[in-house]
Amino acid sequence: MGKLYLVPTPIGNLDDITLRAIKVLQMVDIVLAEDTRTTQVLLKHLGLEKRLWSHHKFNEHAAVESVVETILGGETVALVSDAGTPGISDPGFLLVRTCLEHGVEVETLPGPTAFVPALINSGFSCDRFCFEGFLPQKKGRSKRLQQLLEESRTMIFYESPYRLVKTLIQFAELFGADREAAVSRELTKKFEENVRGTLQELIDHFSAGEVKGEIVIVLSGKPRKAKHEADSDDEE
């Protein structure tokens, strides 16, 4: 029987790949790639030639059984996403679950994921936070946000550059234009940008020009009442 490795890849700067990730990619028989063209660039950078199989959100349900059979047949497989850690707002969960159901050993390597540097760069509390990933674009979006209205922990969202301003406006309407937030863009790349301010200030900043790159929004949680305020509410 083979084995499944989940291998994180750089979120922008190719030099951020770990030595262990390189060793695993050298060793495996097959690399499952979210986009084979993107992964080929990384493999070429590392001087590697591998069998590449396409494995993305549009084909994973149809492909997962075949992949598991391949591993059960003795092949060692690595799953990578275009950037970051597989399974975090990327394909991976379904394959991992199916492998475990079939007794296949799964090993996940530690490595890059965009929300960690964005969270730390924000300056907001990192002790407790909730990762929301990509919000639904239409169905269920309002309900999801309504569920977060009372959230006191720092919240983290992924967003596309094309929807950033629209999402910030929606956040301002729900959470208040004076709620503190931060936006990280193009993390680890040449034009990395980290902007912090109120939601209104962020709307003004990113409305001034075209937004490009991968986006992480970090939203401060609902401020907790001071103890004397909470006591007053109880007395009322």
PLM segments and residue spans:
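Conserved helicase motor
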Residues: S54-H61, F134-P136
